[in-house]
Amino acid sequence: MSTFIGQLFGFAVIVYLVWRFIVPLVGRLMSARQDTVRQQLADAAAAADRLAEASQAHTKALEDAKSEAHRVVEEARTDAERIAEQLEAQADVEAERIKMQGARQVDLIRAQLTRQLRLELGHESVRQARELVRNHVADQAQQSATVDRFLDQLDAMAPATADVDYPLLAKMRSASRRALTSLVDWFGTMAQDLDHQGLTTLAGELVSVARLLDREAVVTRYLTVPAEDATPRIRLIERLVSGKVGAPTLEVLRTAVSKRWSANSDLIDAIEHVSRQALLELAERAGQVDEVEDQLFRFSRILDVQPRLAILLGDCAVPAEGRVRLLRKVLERADSTVNPVVVALLSHTVELLRGQAVEEAVLFLAEVAVARRGEIVAQVGAAAELSDAQRTRLTEVLSRIYGHPVTVQLHIDAALLGGLSIAVGDEVIDGTLSSRLAAAEARLPD
């Protein structure tokens, strides 16, 4: 019995424990599970609602998309039609513009081609004419005939007056011109008393004094002070050169410094000019003036075609003695004998360049030699040598036209083809065949 009671008590305890601890826990678990199931059912219902709404939205979106697509297609069709119309109108305008531009371009090209053809035809005509002229004047008789025809035309020209150009006077102002004229006139009288040796010595001493004055600028300035009383200037030049030069040279220097000069350099130019007049007086006494003039002009032309020689002779960095030695070597190697007066004149000129280009100085010297006889220099260009009769006739015609004796300096240039080119001072008479062809070519259209 007690066993039964004990078992019953144990069962009761177990039931109590189950009821006390297990049942509440299981109840809570069941309640939580029920809540979870209910929540899942609610979520499923909400999801079903959302699915339905999504289906409706999808259907509506499809309908809206179809409607929008239809609208876009219609707008695109309208825009395409409008763009097509605009492009068609623009194409018409562009086609018209291109057509007009093409017409203008065709006109322009036609004008250019016409002008080019005219130009080429003109150049070809001039070229053919040049060939015909060259072939024509290949015969010396025909070439000489062109000179004769030009002389006939020149002979018919109205006489024109021309004064003798005294190169040094042209460089000076009025006071120096008067002084130089007076000095040269005085020297012309004084030179009559000097013999060959006296004139040669005088020329050399004057060049030495001119070089001295060129180096001593202060002394030259005192010698050209424009004072009425020339005594101080005369005493200064006497103290400077007495015992170093001869009496004729000292007398020339006294006379020179007693004059009034417009510029300091004019006194040096005047002294150099008198030295040249002394040498030219020697040539005139020996009847060699024409030879001297011709050789001076010939040497001037040599310097024009030999620039290297001109540079060497005009290099003032080299002592004057060295340049003079070079000049004398060149003259010694000349094909023909050079007149001693020419050698002296050129040597003195190279010594007294004073910064001037040697080719200009030599040409100036040649013009001084010509002007001494009151002659006009005519620079004549010809395609070939003139005959004696043509040269004589040219000299006579030019002398009659200009009213003064004329010295002809002939320059041969085969490129002139025929006729003559004459330059007297600033006046140029160009009757060459080459100039006429060049003028014809210059008149061609650009």
UniProtKB/Swiss-Prot annotation:
Main location: membrane
GO CC terms of this entry: peptidoglycan-based cell wall; plasma membrane; proton-transporting ATP synthase complex
Transmembrane segments: 4-24
Gene Ontology biological-process annotations: proton motive force-driven ATP synthesis
Positions of region (ATP synthase subunit b): 1-168
UniProt subcellular location: Cell membrane
Transport among keywords: yes
Lipid bilayer topology: Single-pass membrane protein
Keyword field contains Transmembrane: yes
Region (ATP synthase subunit delta): 169-446
Keyword terms, alphabetized: ATP synthesis, Cell membrane, CF(0), CF(1), Hydrogen ion transport, Ion transport, Membrane, Multifunctional enzyme, Transmembrane, Transmembrane helix, Transport
One Gene Ontology term of the molecular function aspect: proton-transporting ATP synthase activity, rotational mechanism
Family, per entry: In the N-terminal section; belongs to the ATPase B chain family. In the C-terminal section; belongs to the ATPase delta chain family.
Summary of subunit composition and partner proteins: F-type ATPases have 2 components, F(1) - the catalytic core - and F(0) - the membrane proton channel. F(1) has five subunits: alpha(3), beta(3), gamma(1), delta(1), epsilon(1). F(0) has three main subunits: a(1), b(2) and c(10-14). The alpha and beta chains form an alternating ring which encloses part of the gamma chain. F(1) is attached to F(0) by a central stalk formed by the gamma and epsilon chains, while a peripheral stalk is formed by the delta and b chains.
Further comment: Was identified as a high-confidence drug target.
Name used for this protein in its record: ATP synthase subunit b-delta
Species: Mycobacterium tuberculosis (strain ATCC 25618 / H37Rv)
Gene: atpFH
